[in-house]
Amino acid sequence: MDPPNSLQQGIRFGFHSSSFVENMEGSQDEDNLRLLASAASGSSRDTETPTDHASGSAGGAAGGQSESRPGPSGGGVADLFPELRRLP
């Protein structure tokens, strides 16, 4: 069964012209670009985030001391759950 107007074949039901869809997509791309730019500028101002990635996979801090960060990858399970420190 063919649509009533073959010129509007690629347009979804409910849209009567493609100009609205094109304008909507353009503003979405622009919004995404602004969001990406604000996230990038916000992370560059973060003083807690180290910018030196030369330590490699060893993950050691300068001076040979281990770097401690909050979260599951920093310090191990015993730091997250103090009751586990008592276990042998």
Curated annotation (Swiss-Prot):
Transmembrane segments: none
Superkingdom assignment: Viruses
Ranges of Low complexity composition bias in the record: 34-44
Region ranges (Disordered): 23-88
Keyword Electron transport attributed: no
A Pfam entry, by short name: Adeno_E1B_55K_N
InterPro entries: Adeno_E1B_55K_N
Record keywords: Early protein
Keyword tRNA-binding: no
Something else known: Residues 1-86 are identical with residues 1-86 of the E1B 55K protein.
Protein name (Swiss-Prot/TrEMBL): Early E1B 9 kDa protein
Organism: Human adenovirus B serotype 7
